[in-house]
Each structure stands twice: as structure tokens, then as C-alpha cells.
């Protein structure tokens, strides 16, 4: 087959003419392209890309254990999956960083192998959620796509190379950054060619083959053939530079992660194992559950499932996720950062209603979700079905607090009537306060149990008091634990800034002791105090006394405790008596 010649004209007028002819054929009518008359610049930029190709190094230094600890805050179970994903992803990007740091001093390996990842597991167990969390944490460009939306070039559907172009957009047109991104393709099992299906095989196999080179290493042209926008960009670039712009992305460092439910793969594995075992061993194979069989997956099983051997060969890392039990679903609901409860809190918060769930209620929701047999997705359905009537009625009444109890889930209509009766307001208020106290204690314990990680991450010493304050702030505001800790850290830093302001404005060196900082954090969080208010009180309550001591003794450094802030007169009298008399 002869290689196509590049017939794109270099003359702007010819480009303009061809673009006009293309648009006429495409849209009909007389379409005329009018471009500004701009002469090419005197200097030529041979091969210079139209998009940015920054030389900044990738800033990645996360260790696998750090990423696992982060995922543990959001994902229940999946210990093996979190380990595999964290290790291989961190190694991939740290290897890129190390290579860029070494520069030319590190020779490139011929036949470099990427650790592309294949994730297998039933629907609703958190495959997509895991990858989204990782992408958010590591901060590299990330693109997610559905395998069923793509086709081999020439068939109906998206071109797989569009994924690379989308990655460049996510990187704000920084090609070098895009070359260190992640492409995640879900429902990859849907492009496996099935022996029992006739007709769709060519397209499915074609998509697999189209992915082969990008998954390994290839250069992808960002310009799309026969695309009017690309042609206009070509014209604009030529008019500015006098040269054709090269817009090429190399995929050697782009990590591909694919996932699927693979619902029929267990049967393929069972047949293979049955052939290898006869008699009693064969009966044991038949009794194995689907998830147990998936953990025995081999390359030949995936080939028999309908994948090309070359395609599977480019996915050397396999990650099998566990199915979720009823207890796992309950644990998900108990996690502070779980999106199911946070989302429902946001729903009611939109009407200025604070909602809280008792432990018994969460267990019932988990049981109902497990019966749905759709994994963690069943949690959303169970909560929506249980609370829809309350979400409809409560916004129309003057009610600002709502507690989801076991009784409410078992008798929603009766409880709704009881809840709306004004005579029962105090009863439900007490139920809410009790549930809030229990939830706050649970969150505080969670923070305290993980305070070593949180303290390092936020640069904040977490005493029991600060754990309690963070927990209360989290309970009263819809946010993740990390955001609540960031708020406490921000307030803590603003208090330390007050010390600097006092020194700068009044030439007094005051130092807040830890209990004083905790007291001030509480004022900021619960009473909306401001830096200026605190600064003014420091001047009004302490300046004259501190200034007197400084004039008499030369001392200009003073420590303020919580008691000193609460009872400034007693504190100053004792201090003056001690320092002067």
C-alpha cells in the first residue's frame, strides 16, 4: 500500500480556497472564508508547536503508602486493589520525574514497558470512584471515557485518538504535561468480540487494535483530518509563522487504566479450570463464586473472552476488586467522606435543613441496598426511596433539623405525620441533639485515630480539643474531613498572624499558648470572630499593662493563655505584681 502524499498547500490562499470548498460540500450554499491579511513574520519558527510545550518538570513525589492512606479515607475494603493501583501509579509518575530530573544523564531503555492497568470486578464496587480519587490526589491531567463510545477510525463513533486530544485540553494545551497524563477507559469488556455474536465483531476488534499503539508508544497528531476547526487553526498558524505548525503528542508516558465488570469471564475461567481438574476437583471449581474465579484470571482467559492477545499484552498489571457485603455497605455509610451521605446532606441543606442519620438507620439502609444487588450504587436508591416523602414535605414547613431514625425508615408515612405535628417538636429536637452528639463523637474519634496522618498533611498539631472542634465543624457544615481540617488550619494560621500584627503595630511580642489558640479558634468557628476584632481587643485589654511593664523592666515578650484571654484584669494585675513589685 502506497504511503499517502501530504497535499496540504503551503499557500494561504490555497488553504483558504480548499477550506471554502470543504464547507460548501459539507453545509451547502455559498460559504466564503474571509481571513485577515496578515503577512508571515520575518523570523521562521521551524517545527515550533502552535500549542505550548513547557519545559517544567512534573512535580510528583507521592509514595505508594501515602496514596493508600489517602484512599483509605474514602474507600472501604479493596485492600489489594488500593495497593496495586497506588504502587504502580506512584512508580509510573515517580519514574517519569526521576527521568526528567536526570535529563540526558539517563539513557532511554529500548522497548520500554508501561504499567498499564486492567481492573476487573462487578458493577457498583467503586472502580471509577477509585480512579477519580487518585486523579484528584496526584494532580495530573485525567480523561475518562466509555469504551462503547469509541470505534475504529472509519466506523461510526469517536476516534480513540480523540482521547489524547482531550488530554491536551485537560492540560490547558500544555503538551508536555499532557504527555504525563492518565487515560481511564471504562466498560472495556464491551469491546471484546463474542463468539456468539455476529456483525459487531469488526468494529470491536478494530477499537482494540486502534488502542494498541497509544497504549504502548506512538505520536498522535492533534490536528484532525477534514475538521474545519483544525483547518482554520492551520491557516491562522501559517499566517503568523510562515511555517506549518507541528502538534504532536507522544504517548510513551501516558498511563492507560481500563476497567470492566466482565460478568461472563467467570464462566470462561470455570471451563478452563474444569478441563484441568477431573472428578472431585471439578466439583470444587463449579462451587467457586464469581469473584473467587476472577482472582484466578490468566491472559488466555481474557483472549478466550474476546480480546486480542496484543491488547492484553499491553495491560501487564491486573487488579481484581472484591464484591461488597452488607457489612461493607454499612461501613461505606459510616465513612465521613462517603459521597452518598454527603450528597443527601447537600440535598436537605439546599432548604436550610440539617439532616443526620442514626446508626440503626444506616444499618437498615445498608441491608436494603445489599438486596438490590448493585453494589454501592444500591445505597443511593435505598436512601432516595426512603426519604423522598420527607424531601418533598419538610421544605414547606418551618423545620430546620431532621433525624433519620430506624422508626422513620420502617414507618415513613406515620413518622412524617408525627414529625410535622407541632406538639412533637421538642421530642424530635431532643432526638436530633442526641444523634448529633453521637455523630460528633464518632467523627472526633475518627480524626483522633488518624491524627498522625492528618497532622503531617496539614502541618497542624491535633489535640483532643482540636479533634472535637473539627468534628463539630464537619457536622455543622457539609464538607469532607480534609476540608474541615483545612478550615481549622487556616484559622490557626490567621491567629499566628495576629502575633505578627501586634509586633508590627505595637512593638510588643505576644505569644498565644496552645490553649489560647484553641480558645480563639472556637471564637472564629462558632462566633465568626475576625482578626481585626481580636487585634482590637488585644490592644484595648493588654497594651497599657504590657507597655507599663516594658517601660519599667524592658521586658517586651508576653505569653497569653486561655485564662489570660478570659479574665484579662486578673492576669494583668498578677503579671504587674510579679514583674514590677
Where are these regions (language model features)?
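Non-catalytic accessory segments flanking P-loop/AAA+ NTPase cores
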Residues: 1-581
Amino acid at each position: 500500500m502506497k504511503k499517502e502524499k501530504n497535499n496540504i498547500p503551503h499557500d494561504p490562499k490555497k488553504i483558504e480556497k480548499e477550506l471554502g470548498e470543504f464547507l460548501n460540500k459539507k453545509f451547502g450554499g455559498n460559504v466564503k472564508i474571509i481571513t485577515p491579511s496578515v503577512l508571515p513574520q520575518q523570523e521562521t519558527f521551524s517545527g515550533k508547536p502552535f500549542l505550548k510545550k513547557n519545559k517544567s518538570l512534573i512535580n510528583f513525589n507521592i509514595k505508594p503508602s501515602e496514596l493508600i492512606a489517602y484512599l483509605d479515607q474514602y474507600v472501604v475494603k479493596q485492600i489489594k486493589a488500593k495497593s496495586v493501583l497506588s504502587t504502580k501509579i506512584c512508580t509510573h509518575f515517580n519514574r517519569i520525574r526521576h527521568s526528567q530530573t536526570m535529563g540526558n544523564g539517563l539513557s532511554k531503555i529500548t522497548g520500554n514497558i508501561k504499567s498499564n492497568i486492567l481492573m476487573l470486578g462487578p458493577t457498583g464496587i467503586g472502580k471509577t470512584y477509585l480512579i477519580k480519587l487518585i486523579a484528584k490526589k496526584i494532580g495530573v491531567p485525567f480523561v475518562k471515557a466509555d469504551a462503547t463510545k469509541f470505534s475504529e477510525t472509519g466506523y461510526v463513533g469517536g476516534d480513540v485518538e480523540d482521547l489524547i486530544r482531550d488530554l491536551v485540553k485537560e492540560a490547558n494545551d500544555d503538551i508536555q504535561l499532557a504527555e504525563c497524563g492518565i487515560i481511564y477507559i471504562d466498560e472495556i469488556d464491551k469491546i471484546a468480540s463474542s463468539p456468539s455474536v455476529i456483525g459487531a465483531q469488526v468494529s470491536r476488534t478494530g477499537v482494540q487494535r486502534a488502542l494498541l499503539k497509544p497504549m504502548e508508544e506512538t505520536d498522535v497528531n492533534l490536528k484532525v483530518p477534514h475538521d474545519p476547526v483544525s483547518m482554520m487553526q492551520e491557516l491562522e498558524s501559517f499566517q503568523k509563522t510562515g511555517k506549518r505548525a507541528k502538534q504532536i503528542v507522544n504517548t510513551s508516558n501516558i498511563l492507560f487504566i481500563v476497567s470492566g465488570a466482565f460478568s461472563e469471564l467467570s464462566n470462561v475461567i470455570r471451563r478452563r479450570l474444569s478441563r484441568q481438574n477431573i472428578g472431585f476437583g471439578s466439583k470444587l471449581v463449579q462451587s467457586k463464586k464469581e469473584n473467587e474465579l476472577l482472582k484466578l484470571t490468566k491472559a488466555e482467559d481474557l483472549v478466550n473472552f474476546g480480546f486480542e492477545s496484543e491488547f492484553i499484552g499491553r495491560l501487564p498489571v491486573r487488579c481484581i476488586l472484591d464484591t461488597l457485603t452488607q457489612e461493607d455497605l454499612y461501613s461505606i455509610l459510616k465513612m465521613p467522606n462517603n459521597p452518598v451521605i454527603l450528597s443527601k446532606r447537600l440535598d436537605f441543606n439546599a432548604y436550610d435543613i440539617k439532616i443526620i442519620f442514626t446508626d440503626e438507620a444506616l444499618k437498615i439502609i445498608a441491608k436494603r441496598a445489599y438486596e438490590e444487588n448493585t453494589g454501592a450504587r444500591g445505597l443511593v436508591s435505598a436512601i432516595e426511596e426512603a426519604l423522598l416523602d420527607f424531601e418533598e414535605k419538610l421544605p414547606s414547613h418551618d423545620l430546620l433539623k431532621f433525624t433519620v431514625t430506624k422508626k422513620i425508615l420502617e414507618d415513613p408515612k406515620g413518622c412524617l405525620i408525627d414529625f410535622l405535628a407541632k406538639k412533637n417538636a421538642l421530642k424530635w429536637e431532643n432526638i436530633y441533639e442526641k444523634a448529633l452528639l453521637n455523630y460528633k463523637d464518632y467523627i472526633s474519634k475518627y480524626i483522633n485515630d488518624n491524627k498522625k496522618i492528618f497532622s503531617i498533611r496539614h502541618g497542624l498539631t491535633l489535640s483532643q480539643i482540636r479533634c472535637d472542634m473539627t468534628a463539630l465543624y464537619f457536622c455543622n457544615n457539609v464538607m469532607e474531613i480534609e476540608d474541615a481540617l483545612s478550615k481549622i488550619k487556616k484559622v490557626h494560621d490567621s491567629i499566628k498572624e495576629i502575633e505578627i500584627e501586634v509586633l508590627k503595630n505595637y512593638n510588643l511580642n505576644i505569644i498565644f499558648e496552645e490553649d489560647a489558640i484553641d480558645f480563639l479558634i472556637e471564637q472564629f468557628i462558632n462566633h465568626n470572630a475576625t482578626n481585626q476584632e481580636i487585634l482590637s481587643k488585644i490592644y484595648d485589654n493588654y497594651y497599657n499593662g504590657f507597655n507599663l511593664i516594658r517601660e519599667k523592666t524592658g521586658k517586651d515578650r508576653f505569653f497569653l493563655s486561655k485564662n489570660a484571654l478570659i479574665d484579662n484584669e486578673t492576669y494583668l494585675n498578677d503579671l504587674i505584681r510579679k514583674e514590677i513589685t
